Design a protein with these regions (language model features):
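A short glycine/serine-rich beta->alpha loop
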Residues: 21-24, 45, 109, 148-150, ...
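General beta-strand structural signal in soluble alpha/beta enzymes
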Residues: 71-75, 100-102, 111-113, 132-133, ...
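An extended, acidic
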Residues: 155-315, 325, 330
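Catalytic-loop motifs flanking and including active-site residues across diverse enzymes
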Residues: 30, 34, 116-118, 231-235
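Flexible glycine-/small-residue-enriched beta->alpha junction loops
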Residues: 125-153
């Protein structure tokens, strides 16, 4: 009797996370959880408590996902952040391998003071999709889509950039609005921007929202410029990959140790200007949920037994931008079920 050996089926290949349309909603659930948790501390004046609440909730939500995730942009270096540190593994470990950039509470001061534009943010990409760098400052400049390539350049003066932008938009420099973080380090930038004739929108915190505002058509912001965190720069780049725009960033190192860490991470040119596609490349997904009201998202609305959240989720592969309004019934679920 002739026998045949039945071949075992080949193991299923890991599918990219963005190929699953349901994953967009899963990403939103991560930011919703963080926003809901820290919203209870909005306006209470305790930045650390609000940030920790967001971190705890986001970590729990990430660990519920069917991914093999690695935090590459997080709460800081491993020796300085107990949770969601750079290099931490998150997710069930079963599923697609993804790199994760996150900020559980973008705008901790904003949240503590009850200001505008605080939000929870997460971005995901294929392995190697995000710039891998130490947690340092980054000088940034960004504009929206539909403009000539190279309309702004980080190596040029703010006056030169404004003149080129005004010409591209067929308007006067006086018609332009520049978003800048209100910091002492920006006194010269603010003075030169006003000297050039442009108007300024100063923000207390939250430069992810500031960069995105420069890329959205109805925010009234034409340009973002200034120095903020490197993590926020990568997160903003992830959003711009979906909604379109131009952005450049240069890492700023203050100490020899920061330079040494950068070299250990594979950065050889410490003065390099990174283009948008070098900050966030490949297929990228970005999600954010408002904690307080802002130019892009509404803040959490709490009511007896529940809350309403307002989120945005974007995919660079399709360019699709979805706004998600969710009503959460706390009588039927726990924080982990968000």
């Amino acid at each position: 009797m002739k026998t045949t050996t039945k071949k075992k089926p080949a193991p299923a290949a890991k599918t990219a996370f963005w190929s699953d349309r349901n994953f967009a909603l899963e990403a939103v659930r991560v930011t919703e959880a963080a926003a809901l948790a820290c919203s209870r501390l909005m306006g209470r004046g305790d930045e650390k408590a609000a940030d920790q609440a967001a971190v705890n909730a986001m970590r729990e939500a990430l660990n519920s996902l069917s991914i093999d995730g690695t935090v590459v942009i997080g709460e800081g270096e491993r020796d300085k952040a107990p949770m969601l540190y750079i290099g931490e593994k998150v997710g069930s470990s079963f599923g697609p391998s993804v790199d994760i950039a996150l900020d559980p509470l973008e705008g901790t001061t904003i949240c503590a003071k009850g200001g505008v534009n605080a939000m929870a943010v997460v971005a995901m990409a294929e392995k190697g999709g995000f710039l891998h760098a130490p947690d340092v400052y980054m000088n940034k400049i960004a504009v929206g889509h539909g403009l000539p390539d190279g309309v702004v350049d980080l190596d040029d003066s703010i006056a030169t950039n404004l003149k080129r932008l005004a010409k591209a938009k067929k308007c006067d420099v006086a018609d332009l609005v520049v978003c800048i973080l209100e910091r002492d380090r920006h006194k010269e930038l603010i003075a030169k921007t006003r000297e050039a004739g442009a108007r300024i929108q100063l923000i207390l915190d939250g430069d992810v929202a500031g960069v995105i505002a420069a890329s959205m058509p109805d925010t009234g912001v034409d340009l973002y410029a200034g120095i903020g965190g490197d993590p926020e720069g990568v997160l903003a780049a992830a959003a711009l990959r979906s909604i379109g725009g131009q952005m450049q960033g240069r890492l700023l190192f203050k100490t020899a140790e920061e330079k040494s860490r950068a070299k250990r991470m594979g950065i050889s040119d410490l003065n390099k200007v990174y283009a948008l596609e070098e900050l966030a490349k490949g297929d990228v997904m970005f999600a954010a949920t408002g904690v307080t009201d802002g130019s892009m998202l509404k803040g959490v609305r709490r009511y007896p037994g529940g809350a309403m959240t307002h989120s945005i989720v974007m995919r660079s592969k399709t360019g699709t931008v979805r706004m998600v309004e969710a009503h959460h019934n706390f009588t039927r679920k726990t924080w982990g079920d968000v």
